[in-house]
Every structure is written in structure tokens, then in C-alpha cells.
Amino acid sequence: MAKIKKKGTSGAAKNYITRTQAVRKLQISLPDFRRLCIFKGIYPREPRNKKKASKTSTPSTTFYYTRDIQYLLHEPLLKRFRDQKALSKKIARSLGRGDVGDAARLEKNNAPKITLDHIVKERYPTFIDALRDLDDALSLLFLFANLPSTANVPPKTIALCQRLCHEFQHYLIATNSLRKSFLSIKGIYYQATIQGQDILWLVPYRFVQQVTGDVDYRIMATFVEFYTTLLGFVNFRLYTSIGLVYPPKFDSRSDERGAELAAFTLEGRKVGEMQKAISSEPQTNGQLAKSDSAANDIQAKVDNILKETTRNNEPDDEAVDVEDNVDAIDKFETTAPEADTLPQPQMSGNEVASLFASFTFFISREAPRGPLEFLLRAFGCKRVGWDAVLGEGAFTHDETDPRITHQIVDRPPLPESALPPLPQNPGEGAEKAPRVRPGTRMPGRMYIQPQWVWDCVNEGKLLRHDLYAPGATLPPHLSPWVKASKGGYDPRLSLAEQESDGEAERQAEEENEEEESEVEGLSMDKEMVETENSEAGESDEESVDGGMDVDIPGSDDEEEESEEDNALRELGGSDEAADVQSESEDDEEAARNQHQMELEAEAAGLPFTGADGTGTSSKKSKKQKPLAKKHAAQKKKEQEELERQKMMMSRKKRKLLDKMLYSNKKKDEEAEKLRRKRRKIEQGTKGR
């Protein structure tokens, strides 16, 4: 006889454990358990059947894998948490005795320090794994770097996040690893490629953030504590991989005066220092290390060899011309008009990296200096100036500098009379650079709006300046990660290039019909008001006549006569009526339906807008427009052809085709809706 299984020893009851059981098993508090799970990357699980997973009658809401909790039993942080718990008891005991000094001494000297280095190495065995998990870390750290300091967000945490983020930005600038950027409602998206891994993160706009109380900053602070350690490891590895010293030199005074990126100074590892480090190591064979003079002699010989090779490899002018022609990017064009668009080769990374290298930019004080400076420097610009109000670290604070080739402005063009006058005698502490009147144009300089920088970066080339001039209507700013699909709406193209045949004419006909129906509705409302007034007058006359019945045209007697005439026509009492009925059956059916709708509307007390009393609207509704009729016939023909083709398919392929057709239909309807909206806007603009 088989042994009876004990309940709760196998299946879901064994694989899952509740949060209360896990906390009791680890012997730590619930907040420490949350922190430990965040550090180790352990999150709750959802069993298929909560009743089977729970060993009690009351179903629990939070479950974890039993093997994950068993794995946490060997974590060194548990000892730190228990030491912190014991220290808290000692501090509480000292405060209970009134010994505040002893409590402060215990907190200062005996507080356990928590390090997360081993957890970072454990969770990310390779550097590529750390890069793949860097998206959320960058988004959260950039968020905290822009938050105001509160009791929940101390200034020390904000300063640490800002320093790590600026160090990461300096690496992107030094290696030209930034690829795309997009301005959205949530903030600014950036995408960089590091060692073949695409990293996408979000940076909020620098508005005044209102910190609310419904956000649990303790949980977010735990993530920040782990992500700062992770980003510190990543920055160290990135800097050392390109031969830079980490951490870079940081000038706190410049940072206090708003230098931001300019407060950091990057330094490369010197060859002499590396040789000294190598020479100071003990030799295994007992020989002494080489002296510095010998190392310098070797380095001098290597430098001479490199100079000779570079001198011999210098090409002539003709060779350069040939290489330029060879390296030119070919453009692949389709021969057939209906062929697919061939993917075109793009510029190399070096050309895109030096996109703004030959320009000198000046950022006006109303433009966002931080993201613009980062983008311009990441794509090769070495000379970026801005107004002195925006902080230190600029190439120039003089707006009249003749070396400036592009000025980024984000202000509307105002008349000269609306501008305030400049102070003639600037007070003490004013800027030494001469002030320029707002709206003044300097000769030999391009004035552009900030979107020009983002669009040039996403397109990988310099765009036209006149489209982004101050006060001009900007082109649509599209996401660089969304590719235009065939048949979809593309705001960069004109309506004539993407609309179907006769789409504009059909929409014009629909608009005309809507206008006619609105006019007919207004006329019907007026007639209803007039009839109500006439009925009120007749009721007054009836009351004056003593309640006598008065024959009114269009009363029930006429309706009865019309019903009798219809009955006679059905019986065939009159040959002439039968001939009329055979010739105009459709007209009678339409009139009968219209009459029925009129009666229903009258009984409900609503105006009937389908007819104006003379029958002209019914004729208009019956008569279709030629373009709409032609389009409907074409659609019907295409649908019939498609149904014939579907008959030859299997059931599986037919279902797949139906899904594809349904999704394509939804996309076409959405694109047509957007084109219609744009057409109305353009027509309204032309009408003005």
C-alpha cells in the first residue's frame, strides 16, 4: 500500500512561501526585508492557485519562491541588518534613561556600514549584463538629480546623483556614443550605444517639481542606493576602457556657480606613470627593474618610428581625390515604380560624431542650456557659449562675439516698441560682456530654434535653417524610433503625396452634405416654431368659438382617405393607379418610410430633419454623388475579388489574412482621420 502524502509537502504549497513566513524565517523587520529583496533583485510571484499555495484557510496576497528565500539565508547583509536592529535597541535604552550623549555616541561609532559591491558583482557577472540593466538606473538617477531637496530626499543624495550622471555624460561626449534624442511630454529621451548595447533613458524637464506625499520615497531611496553603486562601477569600467582617470577632477566652486559639465576635468593616464608602476613591481627572476632613463629611450625610439611611418603614409592630393570618390556613399534607387524602397546607406559614425564640429553656438538665456550643451558637445561641438545668467563654463558670454556662427533662441518675434530699454549704466556686479537688445540680429549668424539641434541629430545631417527660424512654424518633431509604415500617416509629407485617389473630393462632398443637412435642420426648426405659433392661435380661436370643431387641412380625415386610396390601389380598383404604382414603387416606399418617420418624430415631440416638407431632401439622399458612387462600386469589386481569392485558401491562412486585413483597416481609418483633420486645419489657414 502506497504511503499517504502529507498536505503541504509538495506542489505549490512547497514552491511558494508567504511574505509573513519569509520575514519570520529571515528574522528581520519588514522594511529590511523590502530593502534586501530590492538589492538582490527578488520580487513577488503570482501562483496559479492561491488556495493551494497558502497553507492557511485565509488566502495570502504576496508570495515568493521558497528557493529565493532560502537563497537569502546566506546573504551577508542579514548580519548588518541584525546589528542595526540591536543598535537601535541600545539607542532606545539610552534615550529612555535620558542619556542623549551616549545615544549619539552609539549612533556615530557603532552604526554598521552597508556595502553593495558584492551584490553588484553577483547580479551582473559580465559587464554587458550591467549595461543591459542600465536603462532604469539612469532614468531614476536623472530624476533624483532634478528633484528639490526635502526631508525624504536629502541634498547629499541629489549631489551624488548629479555627479554620477555628469560623469556618464562626459563619457558619452568623449566617445561620441550618443545616437538619438527625442522631446516628449514626459521629458527628453536619449539613446546611446555602448559596446553594442543600446541604452535608452528618460531625463525630466527642469521645472519646479512639486513633491507630493503619496509617493513612498523609502522604496525609491533603496533603488537609488543600489543604482548609484551600479553606475559607479559602470563609470569606472567605461573610463578605464578609454584610458581616462576615474573619478575625474571635480571643482565644487564651479559647480556651485552653475558650471555643471564644465566643473569636471578629464585626465588621461600618462605613459610615464604606467612605466613607473610596472618598474616598481618585483621581478620574479631576481633582476632589478629597468630604470626610467632606459624606458624613456625606448619610448623615444618608438616615437621616431611612428613619425617615419606617418610621413611615408601621407597621400598626395590626387590620391586624396581618388579616395574621396571611392568613399562616396552610393544611392540605391528602384527601377520599378511599385518596387519596395531600398534601404540607403548612412553616414559613418565619424561623420555623424563631428556634425557640429565646425560651428560655434551661443545659447540664449530662454533656451534649455543643459540638454543643448550635452547634445552639441556629444556631436563634436567644442565651442558653446551662453549668457552669464545661465552659469559658468561657457566658451564665451559675449553675445556680440564675431566667432559665433549659430545662435539658439526660443522667444517670439516682438516689435521694437514692446521691448524694454537696456540700462545705460549697469550697476555694480553686472556682466562685463556687452548687453544686446532682445530681437537684435547680428550679421553673419544663423538664428535657429532648439528643435533644429534635435532634428539634425536624429536625421544625421544638417537641416535647413529657414524652417527653424525664430517665429516660424516648426516641422513636426517625430520619434526617431518609430518607422513610417506603408499607408500610414506621415506628417512630414504633403497630403497630395499620401492620400488615395479622390479622397479630398469625397471629403468635400461629405462636408457639403453635412452643411446642407445643417441648413435643412435650421429650416425645419423655424417651421416647427411657426406651426406651434399657428396652433396656439387656432386654439385661441377655438376657445372663442365655444369649442366648435373646425376642419383643419392635413387632419385625421385626410389620413383616412389616403389609407383608403392605398387600399383601393392594392385591390386594383383603378387601372391608372395600378400603372402609377408599377412605375414608382421605389418612390412610394421611400415616401411611406419618410411619412412613418415623421409620425414617430411628431409623437416624440422632436423635429424631423430628414425632410423639409417638399420632399427635396429625400431626393437628395436618394441621389448619390458620382465620386462616392464610383468609390463604392470600386470597393465592392475589390471585396468580391478578395472573397474569391480567400476561397482558395486554407482555414488557417484565411484566419490569418482576416486578422491582417482587420489591422490594416484600422490603420487606414486612423490615417484617414488624421489626414482629414490636417486638411481642415490647412483649409482654415488658407481661409484666413
Curated annotation (Swiss-Prot):
Compositional bias ranges of the Pro residues kind: 412-424
Span of domain BRCT: 351-470
Residue spans of biased composition, Basic residues class: 619-634
Biological source species: Coccidioides immitis (strain RS)
Biological processes, Gene Ontology terms: maturation of 5.8S rRNA from tricistronic rRNA transcript (SSU-rRNA, 5.8S rRNA, LSU-rRNA); maturation of LSU-rRNA from tricistronic rRNA transcript (SSU-rRNA, 5.8S rRNA, LSU-rRNA)
Subunit structure of this chain's protein: Component of the NOP7 complex, composed of ERB1, NOP7 and YTM1. The complex is held together by ERB1, which interacts with NOP7 via its N-terminal domain and with YTM1 via a high-affinity interaction between the seven-bladed beta-propeller domains of the 2 proteins. The NOP7 complex associates with the 66S pre-ribosome.
Bias type Basic and acidic residues, positions: 635-646
Residue ranges of coiled coil: 496-536, 627-686
Comp. bias intervals (Acidic residues): 510-519, 530-544, 554-565, 576-589
Protein name: Pescadillo homolog
Keywords, ordered alphabetically: Coiled coil, Nucleus, Ribosome biogenesis, rRNA processing
Keyword Calcium in annotation: no
Molecular function GO labels: ribonucleoprotein complex binding; RNA binding
Region: Disordered, residue numbers: 411-442, 496-688
A GO CC term attached to the entry: nucleoplasm
One Pfam family here: Pescadillo_N
Taxonomic lineage of the native organism: Eukaryota, Fungi, Dikarya, Ascomycota, Pezizomycotina
Summary of the function given for this chain in its UniProt record: Component of the NOP7 complex, which is required for maturation of the 25S and 5.8S ribosomal RNAs and formation of the 60S ribosome.
